[in-house]
């Protein structure tokens, strides 16, 4: 289901998800390796790609800003609202691509932002509540009910990607 994405976009996404604690430093280093192999050459990208597995957590903060700057990709402060919005857009994009289920997107948004921390994510938290409600009762949820809710989530994911202030935000 995934359409091929360029390695620089994948590095951006890995950096965004790391900035909100959803991805690991190693994910970023691996994405830098892929970008380097694909021709995104530069001394900072090469240094980031060369970080050892054991040193990824300690070296990333020092090397990532220059590497992203070389690639013309934005750097987000860890746990900033800008990073959270960008991460939400990355995961919304993955849901639309079929790489993340609608339920996984709503669950992450609800656990991460609740109902009032990030207004852009609130509709996903509400949809997560609806998924939870489908699970109650003596009979499991109907396939049609789940499919309808999945469709609502994907509509919301599109709205998130089209929202004002969209940087690259996970779009191809």
What is each PLM-predicted segment?
Residues 1-172:
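Acidic, Ser/Pro/Thr-rich low-complexity regulatory regions
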């Amino acid at each position: 289901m995934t359409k091929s994405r360029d390695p620089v976009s994948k590095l951006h996404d890995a950096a965004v998800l790391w900035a909100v604690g959803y991805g690991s430093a190693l994910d970023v280093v691996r994405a830098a390796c892929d970008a380097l192999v694909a021709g995104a050459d530069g001394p900072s990208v090469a240094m980031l790609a060369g970080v050892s597995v054991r040193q990824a957590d300690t070296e990333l903060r020092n090397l990532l800003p220059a590497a992203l700057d070389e690639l013309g990709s934005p750097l987000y402060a860890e746990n900033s609202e800008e990073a959270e919005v960008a991460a939400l857009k990355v995961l919304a994009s993955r849901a639309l691509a079929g790489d993340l289920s609608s339920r996984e997107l709503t669950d992450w948004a609800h656990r991460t932002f609740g109902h009032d921390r990030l207004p852009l994510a609130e509709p996903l938290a509400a949809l997560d509540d609806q998924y939870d409600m489908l699970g109650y009762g003596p009979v499991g949820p109907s396939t049609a009910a789940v499919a309808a809710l999945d469709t609502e989530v994907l509509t919301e994911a599109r709205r998130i990607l089209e929202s004002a202030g969209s940087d690259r935000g996970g779009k191809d």
